[in-house]
Regions:
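Calycin-type beta-barrel ligand-binding domains and close structural analogs
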Residues: 22-47, 53-201
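Bacterial N-terminal signal peptides that target proteins for export
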Residues: 1-9
Length: 201
């Protein structure tokens, strides 16, 4: 090999090593995030719970999440499946709605129910994927979606563009969901960028 060829080969090896190192780091961060998430969190008038489930056709890191919120003196329950994976060297969260929520209402107490989960039971919230990064300085993970790609049903109304952000630490879970029309006017959700915080129980 000529000196130039050796230099090219060395650069290629260094590039591959850097890529491998990044991939390994993301896998380690995903494992840490998946270990932090399970649990029950309580905030003002609401509770959010995450339980890991076995659904390998989606991902190795899949959770059933259920939120109970007091509205008009009664509890309103919402359910989702969320899955985490590595894509393009980034931690990506995909979210799914359940076709028959009543079938899974005992899912928190009996996560083995989800061993019968199939693709037909799920509806992917396409375009609403969240990218997660680790904030080492504040010992937290931070997630956000791309609003312009995420059209989702807002409570009590039709489709709108959803701006979603979330944080997870060893002590709490926080999130914000704000809805906008095509012109960028806010339709629902908090007016500022503050997150609703839920303490781990």
């Amino acid at each position: 090999l000529t000196m130039a060829e050796r230099a090219v080969a060395l650069c290629a090896l260094l590039f591959l090593a850097a890529c491998s190192g990044t991939a390994d780091l993301r896998k380690a961060e995903l494992s840490e995030l998946a270990g932090l998430l399970p649990g029950t969190y309580e905030g003002a008038g609401a509770s959010v719970a995450f339980v890991p489930i076995y659904a390998p056709f989606i991902s190795d890191n899949v959770f059933f999440t259920e939120e109970t919120r007091l509205q008009g003196g009664r509890g309103e329950v919402s359910q989702r499946i969320v899955a985490f994976d590595i894509s393009d060297k980034q931690i990506v969260q995909a979210s799914y709605l359940l076709a028959d929520p009543a079938r899974w209402r005992a899912g928190l107490q009996h996560p083995d129910l989800f061993k019968s989960l199939m693709e037909a039971d799920l509806k992917l919230l396409a375009g609403c994927e969240m990218l997660w990064v680790k904030d080492k300085e504040r010992s937290r993970f931070v997630g956000a979606n791309d609003r312009k790609n995420c059209r989702s049903s807002r409570p009590g109304s039709g489709l709108a563009f959803l701006d979603a952000r979330a944080e997870i630490t060893a002590d709490d879970y926080a999130r914000s969901e704000r809805y906008f029309d095509a012109a960028g006017r806010q339709l629902a959700g908090p007016r500022d960028e503050a997150l609703d915080r839920f303490r781990r129980q």
